[in-house]
C-alpha cells in the first residue's frame, strides 16, 4: 500500500504517515515530477474547474483521524471578488487527504496538518549525522515501510 509522509517544516520535524490508494499515489507522483498527461486526469480536472469558477485552493488541512481513517479539508477562496484576503476560506470542503494532497501539489497550495493530529499520530524523524551508519538507518526505514499498517497509527 502506498504511503505519503508529511513532515513538519520546522521544530521537531515529525513525520505524519498516511496510507493512500495507488491511483492517488500515482497522481501525486506524476505532479511532483512535472509530468503532464495527454488529457486531464481527475485532479487536473478539479484544478481546472476551480479556475473556471473563479476559485483557488488557499490550503489543505489534514484535520483528524477516526477509526484509522484520516480526514482533510480543502480551503477555497473566491478569486474574483474584491476584498478577499485569503486568510478566511469562502468554502471548506471535506475530502480524503490523498485527494487534497494531489490537488495541492498541482496548484501549489500549502499543506497543513492539525497540531493535535501530529501530536497524536506523528512519528519522530530520525536525525542522521555524519557519524550514523546511513545504510542501517535506510534498512530500518525499509523495514518500517514494509511492515506498517493502519492500526500502528490508531490513537
Predicted regions and their residues:
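Divalent-cation
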Residues: 1-155
